[in-house]
Amino acid sequence: MPSCENRCRVMKKMKVQMARPFLYAFLIGCIIQSAAASAETLRLQRDGPLARDYFNKLEWMRCSIGQVWQDETCQGEIKMLTVAQAEQITAVMRENWGGGWRLPTVEELKGLIQKNSSAPKIDQDTFPNTHQGSYWTGDQSFYTDQYFWTVNFYTGQMYNRFFYFQENAVRLVRDYSIN
């Protein structure tokens, strides 16, 4: 029969060997999470009041409608708008900032969500002072044409149950091509 000392040594070795897969899984999870955060930072290139997403070929306004880009951040009060008001503002932005500005699709706006962050669930370095609530998309709900999709940056969820006359925040986007 093996001595107590040998049995203890064997038990310790077995515990280490059994714990190794869990340790590896934990480390791999940390690496993946870190890589995802780095990829998000690399995907969005900041340029003053704009953020370019080269992967999806989009250019975002860093500030919500109502805010202005000043001193390297978004300042001012975010305007809560109906869909009709958002479309009017979008037309004004196209005139003043060049063509192409529009309300994002639900998929485009959902792409800005950072699931592992606290509210607001968005890269706050790229999109400072973001409203911790719902933002309009240009997509109507499939239930009825009176509902539109929104993306909520407090919860990180999408909703298709907001009436067009309700007021939400707006962040505009346009297609971007590299010349």
Regions found by a protein language model. Name each.
Residues 12-25:
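Bacterial N-terminal signal peptides that target proteins for export
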Residues 24-33:
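Bacterial N-terminal signal peptides
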Residues 57-60, 136-137, 172:
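Bulky hydrophobic/aromatic "packing anchor" residues in well-ordered structure
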Residues 36-41:
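Boundary at the C-terminal end of the N-terminal hydrophobic targeting segment
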Residues 87-100, 106-155, 161:
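An exposed tryptophan-centered "aromatic clamp" motif
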